[in-house]
């Protein structure tokens, strides 16, 4: 199970801070409500930074993202033996991270009686600003492609200041390409919290919009594969 613990802990940190920022910004009755898109992008960027640092200390490459893992593995940047431990750690860590956010904000979910009070699946998972399945899919593919293409050129991104560079990359992707879909660019970041929201007793919750969930699953996976493939061809 090489790297499982690092991916589990790193992804858990990522989701606690990232989804936590969504809860803070949206839920009625907390001091951070009504922040803006820049707040969200910065929070997710720093969440990735600290998640990568944690993962690297526990024996993984700090992927925290199935799109990274699958793309890297298919083109020889990661041993195939590491794929399933990494994926399991990522999805399980993301689920537990979402559970922690639910516990942290439980009274606020209770107070948020309607969607206008901020209690909606968008705290946990992504959704399109304008619903257009084809272009939503392309948006996730393109955003993930550029994220992973740059990532491949950072080398070992768990060491030194590299995790900060990864975090800044997330901020740039979010600010420039993420406004269309909320930039999942990570199937585990979307599916595991969406599942937690679906099956756990979150007070006053709405629908989890599983009809959209194929977009943040397969768009990022395709983007990661294309980025790793291009890097292999040109390097």
Curated annotation (Swiss-Prot):
Pfam families referenced in this protein's UniProt entry, alphabetically: MIP
Presence of keyword Transmembrane helix: yes
Entry keyword Cell membrane: yes
Motif (NPA 1): 65-67
Localization per Swiss-Prot or TrEMBL: Cell membrane
Protein topology in the membrane: Multi-pass membrane protein
Residue spans crossing the bilayer: 4-24, 39-59, 62-82, 83-103, 134-154, 165-185, 210-230
Chief location of this protein within or outside the cell: membrane
Positions of short motif NPA 2: 186-188
Annotated Gene Ontology cellular component terms: plasma membrane
Keywords for this protein: Cell membrane, Membrane, Transmembrane, Transmembrane helix, Transport
GO molecular function terms listed in the Swiss-Prot or TrEMBL record: glycerol channel activity
PANTHER family: AQUAPORIN OR AQUAGLYCEROPORIN RELATED, AQUAPORIN-9
Function in brief: Transporter that facilitates the transmembrane diffusion of water, dihydroxyacetone, glycerol and H(2)O(2). Is not permeable to urea and D/L-lactic acid.
Family that this chain belongs to: Belongs to the MIP/aquaporin (TC 1.A.8) family.
Protein name, entry field: Glycerol uptake facilitator protein 2
Organism of this sequence: Lactiplantibacillus plantarum (strain ATCC BAA-793 / NCIMB 8826 / WCFS1)
Gene, per the UniProt record: glpF2
């Amino acid at each position: 199970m090489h790297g499982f613990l690092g991916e589990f802990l790193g992804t858990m940190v990522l989701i606690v801070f990232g989804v936590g920022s969504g809860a803070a910004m949206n839920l009625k009755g907390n001091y951070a409500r009504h922040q803006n898109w820049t707040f969200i992008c910065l929070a997710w960027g720093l969440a990735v930074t600290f998640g990568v640092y944690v993962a690297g200390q526990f024996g993984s490459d700090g992927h925290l993202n199935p799109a990274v893992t699958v793309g890297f593995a298919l083109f020889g940047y990661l041993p195939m033996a590491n794929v399933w431990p990494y994926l399991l750690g990522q999805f399980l860590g993301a689920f537990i991270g979402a559970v922690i956010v639910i516990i942290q904000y439980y009274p606020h979910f209770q107070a948020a009686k309607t969607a206008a009070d901020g209690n909606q699946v968008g705290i946990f998972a992504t959704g399109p600003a304008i619903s257009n399945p084809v272009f939503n899919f392309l948006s996730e593919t393109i955003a993930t492609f550029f994220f992973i293409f740059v990532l491949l050129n950072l080398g070992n991104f768990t060491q030194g200041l590299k995790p900060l560079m990864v975090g800044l990359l997330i901020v740039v992707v979010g600010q420039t390409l993420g406004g269309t879909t909320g930039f999942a660019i990570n199937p585990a970041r979307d599916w595991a919290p969406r599942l937690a929201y679906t099956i756990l007793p979150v007070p006053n919750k709405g629908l989890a919009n599983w009809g959209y969930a194929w977009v943040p699953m397969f768009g990022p996976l395709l983007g990661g594969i294309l980025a790793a493939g291009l890097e292999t061809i040109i390097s």
